[in-house]
A protein has these predicted regions:
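ABC-type nucleotide-binding domain
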Residues: 4-7, 11-166
Length: 166
């Protein structure tokens, strides 16, 4: 049974600001003797780059996983736009977050079909804007078919860095 449960009185809206704040956050994996994260406090401001730096096993991925509630903090609070993520409706929370896993995976199809996976109604202009944001516009424009360029299963026909940006 999941320890992450939807709220009974969930908040269904947030602002368009998308500020993420960790307020004295702790996290301990079930059955672990020691916490992975201890008293972490910081704010990730919209439009700014926030770097999470640490050695292997230091909790970087765990920290990022707390925002979309892949896990819930065992202490402290994770807030999006001032609202505790545990109070946000899951659909609202997930619609506000773009999570790029360490091992990126692409489906067989086209650049456009992969980009539209999470939002089928996205326009070509919106796809180009997303590619700009991900610093992928230049290499996609260099492909002969651009948005309609074929993508092999798993993204085998693009580099690891390109795969992650897509």
């Amino acid at each position: 049974e999941s320890s992450v449960v939807p709220p009974t009185d969930g908040v269904s809206t947030t602002t368009d600001v998308s500020r993420v704040h960790f307020d004295h956050v702790d996290f301990t994996y079930p059955g672990a003797d020691a916490p992975v994260l201890c008293d972490v406090t910081f704010t990730a401001e919209p439009g700014r780059t926030t770097a999470i730096i640490g050695s292997t096993g230091s909790g970087k991925t765990t920290l990022v996983s707390l925002v979309p509630r892949l896990f819930d903090a065992t202490g402290g609070t994770v807030l999006v736009d001032g609202v505790d993520v545990r109070r946000l409706e899951p659909e609202v929370l997930w619609s506000r977050i773009g999570l790029v896993p360490q091992r990126a995976f692409l489906f067989s199809g086209t650049v456009a079909s992969n980009l539209r996976y999470g939002r089928p109604d996205a326009t070509d202009d919106e796809l180009w804007a997303a590619l700009r944001t991900a610093q992928a516009e230049d290499f996609v424009r260099a492909m002969p078919e651009q948005l309609e360029a074929p993508v092999a299963q798993g993204g085998a026909n693009v580099s690891g860095g390109q795969r992650q940006r897509l």
